[in-house]
């Protein structure tokens, strides 16, 4: 099994190649860089380097996974365009992965907490938000992913008595921690303000999805913006 994964949804730009059966890092090699506004320049280079170093051609890939959002409008378009271009040209199935779920998975790897409050700074005084719990081997979303003002979540009330089991993760906590959890005596198990989604984590999440047959065709590699004021569709980038 060979899966190419990429993510350009936030300030972080990354690509990863998962080759099942290899021992190093669970068979995953990755390129990662915090580089706001440089994703379009970096992502194709990262992909080329990963494939070249592994001696893998695009036609050998079993699937392409990507961070489908939410996140930066431009970043999501870049990832979707690259994925569509490769998938269309080589008839490769696609696995869209939630960036908020990827943050939850990364937070779990860092803290072993199975309860994660994932928040990405959405600008415009809002956060992209999701409440995830790991049940068995699957992340379960409580409610729905949403874009919302931090003041409207009322976490101190809804999570009363549960603070010691929840981890807050993502850039939303760096920007709005005082509003997500105003001074109320409520505290989290941990707060990971610089926890970004990454292609490495997306590749890990994509393995089970591919085995279960949860893929979509290239035409359905669509970003999830959560905001409704996005009109243009990403243009495929052909490799």
Which residues make up each language-model segment?
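Surface "functional belts" at beta-alpha junctions
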Residues: 21-26, 38, 93-196, 231
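Residues at secondary-structure transition points
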Residues: 34-42, 73-77, 81, 98, ...
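Short, basic and Ser/Thr-rich N-terminal targeting/leader segments
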Residues: 9-12, 125, 219-220
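Acyltransferase
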Residues: 190-239
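Stable alpha-helical structural segments in soluble proteins, enriched in small hydrophobic residues
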Residues: 50-54, 89, 107, 202-210
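DPxDG-like acidic metal-binding loop motif
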Residues: 65-99
């Amino acid at each position: 099994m060979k899966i190419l994964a990429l993510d350009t949804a936030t300030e972080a730009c990354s690509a990863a190649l998962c080759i099942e059966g290899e021992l190093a890092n669970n068979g995953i090699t990755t390129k990662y860089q915090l580089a706001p506004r440089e994703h379009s320049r970096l992502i194709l280079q990262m992909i080329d380097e990963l494939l070249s170093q592994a001696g893998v051609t695009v036609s050998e890939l079993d699937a392409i996974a990507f961070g489908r959002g939410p996140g930066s409008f431009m970043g999501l378009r870049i990832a979707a365009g690259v994925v569509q271009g490769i998938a269309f040209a080589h008839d490769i199935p696609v696995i869209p992965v939630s960036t908020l779920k990827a943050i939850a998975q990364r937070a779990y790897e860092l803290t072993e907490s199975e309860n994660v409050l994932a928040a990405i700074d959405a600008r415009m005084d809002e956060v992209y938000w999701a409440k995830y719990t790991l049940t068995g081997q699957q992340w379960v979303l409580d409610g729905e992913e949403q874009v919302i003002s931090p003041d409207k979540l009322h976490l101190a009330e809804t999570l009363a008595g549960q603070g010691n089991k929840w981890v807050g993760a993502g850039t939303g906590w760096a920007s709005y921690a005082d509003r997500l959890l105003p001074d109320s005596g409520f505290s989290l198990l941990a707060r990971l303000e610089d926890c970004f989604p990454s292609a490495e984590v997306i590749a890990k999440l994509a393995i089970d999805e591919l085995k279960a047959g949860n893929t979509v065709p290239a035409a359905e590699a669509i970003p999830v913006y959560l905001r409704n004021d996005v009109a243009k569709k990403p243009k495929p980038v052909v490799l």
